């Protein structure tokens, strides 16, 4: 189920910024983009409709986490927007994840967040009071996500091999925190290069600032895409 296009994180504050960014790409180049909280809360459902009308694929990254019925209802709305992928927090529990799957339907890819890539093992133990290793926590969440009938998880590339071993090889692993070699890591604690993620078995990678803030975003995108596809 591997996606050969890097997913571009559209971390912009307005729809106009998104329009300006996407206009840099040829009209016939269909991208896979991530719309996160900032952009969705600023622009609303219109941002999803706009991007879909251009023919791009959309990962709507809202990380829903609420009681099962509320999440089910919200997912029904997102399904009507035509998103290609969306997510929930695995910490919401198996029943919540099952409700999310029911609300979204079987078409779009539904994944769960395990531990955020900004979370260190020390932070997890101190704040969340989870007294295992970070990897054990992530694998546990992944197993529960599979049990709930979801397609996969958001995880660091460091955990991909263990997750697929604990679930199955078709279980989707989407990896954020991807940086080209030599790029600044920002606020991500656990990062890898596109080639590293390819070699370790990630199915999707998410790349933001190295593309969106590049002097030439189109060239940066194609360079990262080549690294991701080991070309």
Swiss-Prot record:
CDD domains: OMP_decarboxylase_like
Entry GO terms, CC: cytosol
One BP term from GO: 'de novo' pyrimidine nucleobase biosynthetic process
Major enzyme class: lyase
Catalytic activity: orotidine 5'-phosphate + H(+) = UMP + CO2
Residues the record marks as active site: 63
Annotated residues for binding of substrate: 11, 34, 61-70, 117, 179, 188, 208-209
Domain of life the protein comes from: Bacteria
Family membership: Belongs to the OMP decarboxylase family. Type 1 subfamily.
Complex formation: Homodimer.
HAMAP family in UniProt: OMPdecase_type1_B
NCBIfam families (UniProt xref): PRK00230.1, pyrF
Designated name of the protein: Orotidine 5'-phosphate decarboxylase
Organism field: Streptococcus thermophilus (strain CNRZ 1066)
Gene: pyrF
């Amino acid at each position: 189920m591997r996606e050969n296009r890097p997913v571009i994180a559209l971390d912009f504050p307005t729809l106009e910024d998104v329009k300006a960014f996407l206009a840099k790409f040829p009209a016939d180049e269909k991208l896979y983009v991530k719309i996160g909280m900032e952009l969705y809360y600023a622009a609303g459902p219109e941002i999803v409709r706009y991007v879909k009308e251009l023919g791009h694929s959309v990962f709507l990254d809202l990380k829903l986490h609420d009681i099962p019925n509320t999440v089910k209802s919200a997912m029904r709305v997102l399904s009507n927007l035509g998103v290609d992928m969306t997510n929930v927090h695995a910490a919401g529990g198996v029943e919540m994840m099952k409700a999310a799957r029911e609300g979204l339907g079987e078409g779009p890819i539904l994944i769960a967040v395990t531990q955020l890539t900004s979370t260190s093992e020390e932070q997890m133990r101190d704040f969340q009071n989870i007294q295992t290793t970070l990897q054990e926590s992530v694998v546990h969440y992944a197993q529960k996500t599979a049990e709930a009938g979801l397609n996969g998880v958001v995880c660091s590339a460091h955990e991909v091999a263990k997750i697929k071993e604990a679930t199955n090889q078709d279980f989707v692993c989407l990896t954020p925190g991807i940086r080209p070699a030599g790029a600044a890591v920002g606020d991500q604690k656990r990062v890898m290069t596109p080639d590293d993620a390819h070699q370790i078995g990630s199915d999707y990678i998410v790349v933001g600032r190295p593309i969106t803030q590049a002097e030439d975003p189109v060239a940066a995108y194609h360079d990262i895409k080549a690294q991701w596809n080991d070309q």
